[in-house]
């Protein structure tokens, strides 16, 4: 089943894949990493002016990593804001996705957290560095194939 946004994207020749609707009826679309930045700009111009959240997850051990964006179209004339969920999948070996910081500034810390926990590099992000873990931390703690070091070996003696 195709939603309003997916139909609009098809009408304008914008490549994407419809993933259907979630339990709240929010349309979910898959965008290729190489197309994401230009489509993000198009969505902003179309009216999706608010990035509600960005998160990332490990799809399966040894599989793809996903970056998920929840966008909202807020207009004064609309009683019910229109929402869409965008999923961008990246290969595990060298996960690179264009940053949307320059489109929605609120992506700043959210993309940094996804980098810190899963190792997804957001190209052209102005300050992409660890935000939760120490800079010296090795590995990506939320990957399903991550092997946690013994906690007592990594903490400093106090």
UniProtKB/Swiss-Prot annotation:
Signal peptide: none
Protein family membership: Belongs to the complex I 30 kDa subunit family.
Record note on quaternary structure: NDH is composed of at least 16 different subunits, 5 of which are encoded in the nucleus.
Stated role: NDH shuttles electrons from NAD(P)H:plastoquinone, via FMN and iron-sulfur (Fe-S) centers, to quinones in the photosynthetic chain and possibly in a chloroplast respiratory chain. The immediate electron acceptor for the enzyme in this species is believed to be plastoquinone. Couples the redox reaction to proton translocation, and thus conserves the redox energy in a proton gradient.
Broad enzyme group: translocase
Keyword vocabulary terms for this entry: Chloroplast, Membrane, NAD, NADP, Plastid, Plastoquinone, Quinone, Thylakoid, Translocase, Transport
Any single GO CC term annotated in Swiss-Prot or TrEMBL for this entry: chloroplast thylakoid membrane
MF GO annotations: NADH dehydrogenase (ubiquinone) activity; quinone binding
Record bears the keyword Iron: no
HAMAP family (alphabetical): NDH1_NuoC
Subcellular location: Plastid, Chloroplast thylakoid membrane
GO terms, biological process: photosynthesis, light reaction
EC number, as in UniProt: 7.1.1.-
Name of this chain's protein: NAD(P)H-quinone oxidoreductase subunit J, chloroplastic
Superkingdom per UniProt: Eukaryota
Membrane topology according to the record: Peripheral membrane protein
Reaction catalysis annotation: a plastoquinone + NADH + (n+1) H(+)(in) = a plastoquinol + NAD(+) + n H(+)(out); a plastoquinone + NADPH + (n+1) H(+)(in) = a plastoquinol + NADP(+) + n H(+)(out)
